Structure formats: structure tokens, C-alpha cells
Regions:
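Nucleotide-activated sugar donor-binding and catalytic core shared by glycosyltransferases
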Residues: 1-182
Length: 182
């Protein structure tokens, strides 16, 4: 078609380049100075209900960290609060990029958030758990080696993926230990 085009950048990369670690983020959100583990449980209630309890089970093992959950717009705070069992868990809305910018590590639901987390250079564990029947059907229809965008783009396991039965407290703790000690 011979159109004249000019590449001017990507809005996500522009947004990320403007983020800096900020003590004001801690103060405004009533967070302590303890390091943050970001938790991105997804945007649909059904996926949050399945994954968030496992994700937040890590808080008891890491009392010197704050687990900060990036809450999805449109889901009321009370829905998230049913999952709070530890003192070091906080829920924030509309601050996903600020959470990532200030995180030492992240536990992330498979999807666009995995790529965003990687662009912030935050070590992550990618989590996916759905209904068994949906998972089995998808495995038959879709033939991919990985579920995270990071791994798909790189065609290599750059970030650890915990899928279905592998997403459990024991495995997640093992992988988070590796991230936090490397």
C-alpha cells in the first residue's frame, strides 16, 4: 500500500519509563518501609477466588515483606478483604504500575500483567489455575509451550510458571524463596 508511517513509541513503555521508586508511595498508602511483594491476581472474580488464597498464603512465610495486591477496577474492596489473613497484606486500587515499580518480586496471574511486570524488571512467578475441564479443552486446542507472554515472546522459560495443580502453597513458597535469595 506504500503508506508513509512514523513509529513514535509505545504508551506502555512511555508510562513505565516515568516511574521511579518513591517513598511517597509508601506514605500515601500507609505502608511501612518493609520491602514489597506485588500480587497481581487478575481481573475476574472467579480467577481471583481460585488464585488469591494461594498467593496470599505466602504472607505468613515472609513477615518482613508487605504483600500488596493490585486490585482490579470494578471489583469492590470487600470482595478482596475476605482473603486477608495476615497483617502484612494490603489492597490498592488503580496503582498497579506503582506497586510493580516498588516491588522486590511479584506473584502474577498469566496475562498482560506478566509482560508489564517484566518491563519493570521485577522478578516474577506466573500463576494460572482454571477449571479442570476448561484447562483440558484448552490444552487440546492450543499447542503452546508456555502461558506467560514473557516466555512466549522469548520462546524460553524466563519466568517460572505454576499451572493448575502445580500452583500450590508448597511450590509457590519454593519458587518465591528462589526469587528472593537470588
Amino acid at each position: 500500500h506504500d503508506y508513509q508511517v512514523t513509529y513514535v513509541g509505545h504508551p506502555l513503555l512511555d508510562e513505565i519509563s516515568n516511574k521511579v521508586k518513591n517513598s511517597l508511595f509508601y506514605k500515601v498508602n500507609n505502608l511501612s518501609a518493609e520491602p514489597i511483594i506485588g500480587v497481581l491476581p487478575g481481573s475476574r472474580k472467579q480467577e481471583i477466588a481460585v488464585k488469591l488464597p494461594v498467593m496470599l498464603s505466602m504472607a505468613k512465610y515472609y513477615p518482613k515483606f508487605q504483600f500488596v495486591v493490585a486490585c482490579a477496577p470494578g471489583i469492590e474492596k470487600s470482595y478482596y478483604e475476605q482473603f486477608v489473613r495476615e497483617q502484612n497484606v494490603f489492597y490498592l486500587f488503580n496503582q498497579t504500575y506503582d506497586i510493580l515499580q516498588n516491588s522486590e518480586a511479584a506473584i502474577v496471574t498469566s496475562g498482560t500483567a506478566t509482560l508489564e511486570t517484566a518491563l519493570f524488571n521485577v522478578p516474577q512467578i506466573v500463576c494460572y489455575k482454571g477449571s479442570l475441564i476448561s484447562y483440558l479443552i484448552a490444552r487440546q486446542l492450543i499447542k503452546v509451550k508456555y502461558i506467560s507472554l514473557v516466555n512466549l515472546i522469548m520462546d524460553s522459560e524466563i519466568v517460572k510458571e505454576l499451572i493448575q495443580a502445580d500452583l500450590n502453597e508448597k511450590n509457590l513458597k519454593f519458587e518465591l524463596d528462589k526469587l528472593l535469595t537470588s
